[in-house]
Amino acid sequence: MKILAANAQADSSNTEARQSLLFSQSPIPNAESRLLVAGVDEAGRGPLAGPVAVAAVVFDPNKPRINGLDDSKQLTAERREQLYARIVDRALAWSVVLIDSEEIDRINIYQATMLGMRRAVEGVAHVAGFARIDGNRVPKGLPCPAEALIGGDALDRAIMAASIVAKVTRDRLMHELHAQHPEYRFDQHKGYSTPMHLAALQTHGPCPQHRRSFAPVRLALEGREQGSAAIGDPEQLQVAQLVAPL
């Protein structure tokens, strides 16, 4: 696990005010609330390779509203990059945490995602009094009150921003990993279980960036260890793809 990036633009003269917000008893902030809300989302739970990225974003209420925000999955790569630049420029605070494939295999993808969410919120907790998290679970041990919001990446602007920051960060890293392992074409599929990726697993077996606890990777590895000419049957890999963790 590592915190890839963190930025805070809050000024220290507001320390007392921020502390009073942080310890507010209001359970869920509304439009009238003075709480600064961190939106939290992840990218990369489902892929067979690479890290899971989790971002937290707190908007600066004194900066212009960012138009065009949406769930990162609904945006083109070019549009995500454009919005990413605006988000990190106008956010009061933001953070991104990467949990690598080794840690994912050690504690499982669910726990890795929860860990990433907790660390991402900790990265903005000096300004955020509340966290709103995409999904149906709130991680334990957060430094501030929080709620889970199913479908939040299509409903809440701060979560939309977090989804974009997480996605852009992870995609950039997968391009870097492609340079190290070009045979897998991580730049094309970003580690997801596409036919291209499954074919590369058959031919080359897994690399250190692959998640060995995921069924298609495990099947490919077992095939190589058994010395088979072909690493598993293509139909078996397709079936394994369907049961890989989401």
UniProtKB/Swiss-Prot annotation:
It is found in: Cytoplasm. One of its GO terms (molecular function) is manganese ion binding. A divalent metal cation binds at D41, E42, D134. Manganese or magnesium. Binds 1 divalent metal ion per monomer in the absence of substrate. May bind a second metal ion after substrate binding. Residues 35-226 form the RNase H type-2 domain. Belongs to the RNase HII family. This is Ribonuclease HII. It comes from Xanthomonas oryzae pv. oryzae (strain MAFF 311018).
